[in-house]
Amino acid sequence: MSGNLRILAAVSATAALILLGPAVALADTDGITVHCVNMTSLDPRFSSCDDQHPTIQDAVNDAEAEESVLVGAGTYPEQVTVVRPLLLEGAGTASTTIKPGIVTSNTSSLFSGAPIAAIVLVNGTTGVAVTDLTVDGSAAASTFACSPGYVGIFYRASSGAIEDTHVTNVFHPLAPGCQTVLGIFVQSGNGGPGLNSNVAILNNVVDFYGKNGITANEPGTFVTVTSNMVTGRGATGLGDAAQNGVQIGFGARGLVSGNTISAHDYTPPDFVACGLLFFRAGGGLGRAKGNTFVANEQDICTAGVGPSSNSPFN
């Protein structure tokens, strides 16, 4: 089965349209299209494996464009960088976990150049699907403070889909007020050739994050945020972050629909925690529909002029 067909089989029709786009399928050069990691015969996908790898990054490095990396059950203590179109699929959020014990800066903000440590980095490519796994930042969270920024899944000038994943514990317990700690981040650096990002974020659980659950920033970024459960840390106060569940900001555009967004609250009222924050976004309230908001200080916030003291780094 070709890489395109595997991606179509793994993600929803909405996401597949984004993944495939106008690209022409690339020819396989080595006869290996399905790269497996720690896969055993107990996994129903085992018969489709063309090879086996000890780590996710090893399999990703070996995969050609539009091929598949299927990850077996287990906990993988690594950061992963993807730079070509492929499917990265786990055995389910309860079975496959990417949980590094330590993270280092592996990229930077396209806008400011600030260093970022991403657990899963999708950098400068299209057609990348991440599905059926957990990204857990807890083990590395106490090993550094507010710099570099800390991100669970970062689509940096990249397009594709994140579906049926759990992004959790991207949070600094010893420095909870850090503003650069995000569950999922999609960025385009003000757009331009090779910089646009178009990502479908579908049916995920994003929880226990530092600042924002899902963030999309800058012109050239479009996100479809649908059927996710985004849960903040509840009441936070002085020295902590005023959290936002979903942020569409700085010229980014997005459709936010059918999500459950809860537990964002900040005291004192100098700053506001928002379930959904549109900050100088390319689209307004018309781009949000059918969401369920529970226990947020403010369910939907909009800001259109000047800097906001309640927005993460850009």
What is the predicted role of each segment?
Residues 76-78, 88, 94-95, 127, ...:
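Extracellular beta-strand scaffolds
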Residues 24-58, 62, 73, 91:
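Right-handed parallel beta-helix/beta-solenoid
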Residues 102-121, 143-154, 175-193, 208-217, ...:
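Extracellular beta-strand/beta-solenoid scaffold signature
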Residues 10-21:
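Bacterial N-terminal signal peptides
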Residues 64, 83-84, 93, 124-125, ...:
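Parallel beta-helix/beta-solenoid
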Residues 1-11:
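Bacterial N-terminal signal peptides that target proteins for export
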Residues 57, 61-65, 76-89, 97-132, ...:
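Extracellular beta-strand-rich solenoid/capping regions of secreted or surface-exposed proteins
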